């Protein structure tokens, strides 16, 4: 049986990371607002409030989570570019998904995601090779190079989009 938590598998990448990989990942980050918008197109309120799996988040919560996560990532990139290996602040994503703003219409987060990604992608395309080696420190997962973080967040967007598209396929929406 497929693991509904990881419809595209867990994040992995080939080493060494190449410029082509970075370019592909940045393009995936750039495409995410459109891909996520397409994934929820024509879903009604009941469908948006359907969990993608038993015990999982609703489609609505997934959309809001993507924005929460990518806002945090954008800030982590800016910190890593302006400080030496900064320790970033983790957050309790499962608790954030329960806050009242996670019940707002998904359009609110889609607009935010589009604007955020325009800024983030602009920043990513401006990076020099040496910038990709810069790091941030996560108190739980350790040091992460920006090159790896680009891949991780490209995967993250595809991962959550696949939660929605695989749910649609399973339920014939």
Swiss-Prot record:
Its main location: cytoplasm. Keywords: Cytoplasm, Hydrolase, Metal-binding, Zinc. GO terms for cellular component: cytoplasm. Its cofactor is Zn(2+). Binds 1 zinc ion per subunit. InterPro entries: DinB-like (IPR024775), DinB/YfiT-like (IPR034660), Put_metal_dep_hydrolase_YfiT (IPR023774). It is found in: Cytoplasm. Coiled coil: none annotated. It holds the Pfam family DinB_2. The keyword Metal-binding applies. GO terms for molecular function: hydrolase activity; zinc ion binding. Zn(2+) binds at residues 65, 156, 160. It is an enzyme of class 3 (hydrolase). Its EC number is 3.-.-.-. Homodimer. Belongs to the metal hydrolase YfiT family. NCBIfam families: PRK13291.1. Possible metal-dependent hydrolase. This is Putative metal-dependent hydrolase BC_2708.
